[in-house]
């Protein structure tokens, strides 16, 4: 008889967003006259179609698959070089230097923020903001890791800060935060980087909503902070930036500077460990998707996406009457 991972007994039977979707569906079926009045606070899907340049790129990539000279089969697990360079160029336009070799392309930030836990022992202490994206808690609960919560409240502007009395090995930060939208400024992020460096911790930084930052003084990447490449992994996605919720594209930055000492005294690179994990368990994001995503990261592509983002930002007022 197999021995089961009994940590699954400690997670709820249904994932939060799946449960919200189920309840909404039941309500729609029982109240069809009110279905169009529902304000959905679940997974937060997009409603606008993919942009013109992305659709054109998808057609180009599909057509290339019909010609033997341009057909693409298995690709590199880390992602095609052209796509990783496009991402690095996007970082550069925002004043941040990221080595394309540190970028790993995947099918969603959900996958990577969940799978990254495989690099860390289950006896780590994990620090998680509350409220935040539920994947962080569920995946670490499934692993059996100890979770400590740091409360985001109105008093701290929903941006919890380091507490020197708390020792954490793994720190999750999400900025802009899902679901509050609160964003850390440079001084606040520096405090977190300093804390991580002092305590030999790793920050898992989710920047999936970075394109929604309108204040130019706010950092769109943790790598805007000196020392971050020695203590932080960054996750980002095109789900909300470019409407890729159904198309699926994300990227994770694991700097080569990110090294820790194993219990046997060996120095291990998280970059090399993640590369080994991905090459074993992931066959790469489809070429067609990467080709289209690379178009997003051009100046023209981002300008088109920004129009959609401005539309979504204009809808924020809808939630105002529901706030306490």
Task: Name these PLM-found stretches.
Residues 43-48, 79, 110, 133-134, ...:
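Short, solvent-exposed loop/turn segments at secondary-structure junctions
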Residues 314-324:
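Residue-level detector of conserved catalytic or cofactor/ligand-binding positions
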Residues 3-107, 115, 296-302:
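N-terminal small-domain helix-loop-helix segment of the aminotransferase-like
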Residues 30-32, 96-97, 223-227, 267:
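Short, conserved catalytic or adaptor-binding loops enriched in Gly and charged residues
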């Amino acid at each position: 008889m197999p021995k089961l991972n009994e940590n699954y007994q400690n997670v709820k039977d249904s994932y939060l967003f799946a449960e919200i979707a189920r309840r909404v569906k039941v309500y729609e079926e029982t109240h069809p006259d009110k279905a169009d009045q529902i304000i959905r606070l679940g997974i937060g899907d997009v409603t606008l179609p993919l942009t013109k340049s992305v659709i054109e790129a998808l057609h180009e990539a599909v057509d290339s698959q019909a010609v033997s000279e341009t057909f693409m089969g298995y690709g590199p697990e880390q992602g095609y070089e052209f796509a990783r360079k496009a991402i690095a160029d996007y970082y550069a336009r925002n004043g941040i230097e990221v080595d394309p070799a540190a970028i790993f392309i995947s099918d969603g930030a959900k996958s990577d923020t969940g799978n990254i836990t495989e690099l860390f022992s289950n006896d780590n202490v994990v620090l998680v903001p509350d409220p935040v994206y539920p994947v962080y808690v569920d995946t670490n609960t499934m692993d059996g890791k100890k979770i400590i919560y740091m409360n985001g409240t109105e008093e701290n502007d929903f941006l919890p800060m380091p507490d020197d009395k708390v020792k954490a090995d793994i720190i999750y930060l999400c900025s802009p935060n899902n679901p509050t939208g609160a964003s850390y400024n440079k001084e606040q992020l520096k405090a977190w980087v300093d804390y991580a460096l002092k305590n030999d911790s790793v920050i898992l930084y989710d920047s999936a909503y970075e394109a929604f930052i309108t204040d130019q003084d706010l950092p769109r990447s943790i790598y805007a902070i000196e020392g971050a490449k020695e203590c932080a992994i960054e996750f980002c996605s095109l789900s909300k930036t470019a409407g890729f919720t159904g198309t699926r594209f994300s990227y994770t930055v694991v700097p080569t500077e990110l090294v820790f000492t194993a219990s046997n005294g060996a120095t291990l690179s998280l970059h090399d460990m993640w590369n080994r994990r991905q090459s074993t368990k992931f066959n790469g994001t489809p070429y067609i998707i990467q080709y289209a995503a690379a178009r997003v990261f051009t100046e023209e592509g981002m300008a088109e996406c920004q129009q959609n983002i401005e539309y979504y930002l204009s809808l924020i007022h809808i939630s105002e009457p529901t706030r306490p």
